[in-house]
Amino acid sequence: EELNVLIGSDAVEDADIKEAVKLNTLMLLHEKYGITERDFTRAEIEVVPAHKARDVGFDRSMVGGYGHDDRVDAYPALMAEIETKDPVHTTVCVLTDKEEIGSDGVTGMQSMYVFHFMQLLCRAAGQDDILAFQNSVCLSADVTAAYDPSWANAFEPQNGTYAGRGVAFFKYTGSRGKSSASDASAELVGDITDRKSVV
């Protein structure tokens, strides 16, 4: 989060120009994309590594790539929703944004868009939205940290997750103890693990 983005180092060949590198970079941006300096005052810019995902390790057993933590969750969730045919109960897949900053903003889960969508869905089906929420189950997909012996104090070796040992299943989330915590009931955990023979 404290990295600086490198966007250019060549300067315009004019000794009288004070910000020669900046001018050269702006000229290139305008030539290639039609971007001017004024656009930066109102633009939403996301800078990400451009390389593709690649194998990691001598045995090529791991994957490294920008955004892979989100992709490995989003893709299976979306495909599960697409491939679900004639479900007994209505199924919904939510792919959302802004998780890294506390899920704030109009596209984060702290906003009301999912709640409003579910209300509209219930109304369209002629169902009571309060009862629908009370009878709903939600699973949240994310990655977790595998045990790292370099930072052993941050893990519980006998109750933690390890790389290469399958899917991790957590009944709670949160940070700094109980801050922003959500804890699934024992009944829900039991139902999911028994139904799918997870444990």
What residue spans do the PLM features occupy?
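N-terminal hydrophobic/helix-forming segments and targeting peptides
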Residues: 1-199
